[in-house]
């Protein structure tokens, strides 16, 4: 579904890690090819493994890391993709950091401790929190926020709330109140989607346009 709120790619061979596999020929080939494809598909997050070292990139705009704001714990409405490389959950092996100055790496860690990453997704946020598995202390956390566009709906809510009931017929006023109530409830609904917002905005606009003034003959 191309219209889903969040898009995640998961595959094994990390293209943005900081251990020895980062310089493998097949990894370099993937790094030269895949980011463009991911950009075209509007991917938000890429989760990877293989090179057993924790690495979180900056937001990557194509092949270019956005380092303008330094290392952040969250971004809002970003351009680009976040790439995260897992370390090892089993502790079977750990790879040392060989590229500590990699320009794409915002956070890297090799403490030779097992790690796990929890992903929590809502309509407006995508949070990745990585823990040390031995005591569940936090190694790193990062959240991407996407704000919903509610400006048009909020403008119509204000317009509707400023109208005088006495000026309009009961039937048209009741239709307006139903649309207004739905829009206001949606404004504070954490699970609302942009499609929900757009539909409520349209319904409220139609209700306002459909108001009939008292004493006006519509026949």
Predicted regions and their residues:
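Short amphipathic alpha-helical segments, especially helix-boundary/capping motifs
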Residues: 9-11, 31, 156-159
């Amino acid at each position: 579904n191309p219209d889903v709120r969040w898009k995640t790619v998961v595959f094994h061979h990390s293209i943005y890690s900081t251990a020895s596999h980062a310089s493998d020929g097949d990894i370099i080939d993937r790094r030269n090819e895949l980011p463009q494809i991911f950009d075209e598909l509007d991917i938000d997050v890429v989760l990877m493994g293989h090179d057993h070292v924790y690495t979180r990139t900056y937001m990557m705009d194509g092949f270019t890391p956005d380092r303008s704001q330094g290392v952040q714990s969250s971004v809002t409405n970003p351009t680009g993709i976040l790439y995260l490389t897992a370390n090892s959950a089993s502790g079977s092996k750990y790879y040392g950091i060989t590229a500590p100055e990699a320009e794409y790496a915002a956070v890297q860690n090799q403490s030779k401790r097992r790690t796990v990453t929890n992903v929590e997704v809502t309509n407006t946020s995508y949070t990745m929190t990585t823990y040390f598995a031995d005591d569940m202390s936090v190694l790193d956390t990062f959240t991407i926020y996407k704000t919903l566009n509610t400006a048009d709906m909020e403008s119509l809510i204000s317009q509707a709330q400023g109208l005088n009931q006495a000026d309009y017929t009961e039937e048209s006023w009741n239709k307006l109140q139903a649309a207004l109530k739905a829009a206001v409830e949606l404004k504070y609904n954490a699970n609302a989607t942009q499609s929900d917002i757009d539909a409520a905005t349209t319904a409220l606009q139609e209700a306002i346009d459909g108001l009939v003034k008292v004493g006006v003959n519509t026949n």
